[in-house]
Amino acid sequence: MGKLKGMVPFLTEDEIQELVGGLARTIEREYEGRDLVLICPLKGSVLFCADLMRKINLPLIVDFVQLTSPKGESVRILKDLTINIFQKDVVIVEEIIDAGRTLSFLRDRILASHPASLKIVALLDKPARRELPIQPDYVGRTIDDRYLIGYGLDSEEIGRNYRDIYNFAQ
């Protein structure tokens, strides 16, 4: 697969799957016997959500949202939830938490629908970039401030399909 110039390996596919498996086992233990709903923000979280839900050995429902938050503008909904999450146990599935603006908006919107519980799982957490006080409940790995590409993470829509995650020197 052609790589973009300036890409340095950060996490291999095997390392990613090990993180995903650990997160899935933790979620599975916590939600055993409960109605679980995974919310997958498009586009970046699709690969992580697909891998995570296949590793969670529980009945679950998945729904998708798409939000946009251009720099300096407010968050807008491009695709909203299609299922009722009232009194359901909801987990937002994020591939990476950066500034937290979009995730904070989504969390508040979901809480307004009165789920039984709401938690956040993040494959990668980048607290150094946080603009809002939002914390994931489950984290695959906490990272420093770096620009990553692959496994759903993109550079102008390129690289989401890479199996590994790369540090991208802009």
State what each model feature region is.
Residues 1-170:
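PRPP-associated nucleotide enzymes
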